[in-house]
């Protein structure tokens, strides 16, 4: 099962693979049950996993920065 495959959610590389998989399923509607499109599906899953890892890393870094900002406010200069 794949996550939402809407084009605006993924990189161009993954969108190409999504379109290839959809086209393969459309053209080979019986053979897809016997693994005809599995190679494209494997590549798509690799791409989606890489996207997920990148987004998770960015989110973690953003969270760390926000926690630093909230819990360690900059010292104001006293006059």
From Swiss-Prot:
Pfam family for this entry, one: Cmc1
Location(s) in or outside the cell: Mitochondrion
Residue interval(s) of motif Cx9C motif 2: 37-47
Domain CHCH: start-end pairs: 11-55
Domain of life of the organism encoding this protein: Eukaryota
Keywords (A to Z) from UniProt: Disulfide bond, Mitochondrion
Principal location listed in the UniProt entry: mitochondrion
Disulfide bonds: 14-47, 24-37
Motif Cx9C motif 1 location, chain numbering: 14-24
Keyword Mitochondrion listed: yes
Assigned GO CC terms: cytosol; mitochondrion
Functional note: May be involved in cytochrome c oxidase biogenesis.
PANTHER family, A to Z: COX ASSEMBLY MITOCHONDRIAL PROTEIN, COX ASSEMBLY MITOCHONDRIAL PROTEIN 2 HOMOLOG
Family statement drawn from the similarity comment of this UniProt entry: Belongs to the CMC family.
Protein name from the UniProt record: COX assembly mitochondrial protein 2 homolog
Organism: Homo sapiens (Human)
């Amino acid at each position: 099962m794949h996550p939402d495959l809407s084009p605006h959610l993924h990189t161009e590389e993954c969108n190409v693979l999504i379109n290839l998989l959809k086209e393969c399923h459309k053209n080979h509607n019986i053979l897809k049950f016997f693994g005809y499109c599995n190679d494209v599906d494997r590549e798509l899953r690799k791409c989606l996993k890489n996207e997920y890892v990148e987004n998770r890393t960015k989110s973690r870094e953003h969270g760390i920065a926000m926690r630093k900002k909230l819990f360690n406010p900059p010292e104001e200069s006293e006059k």
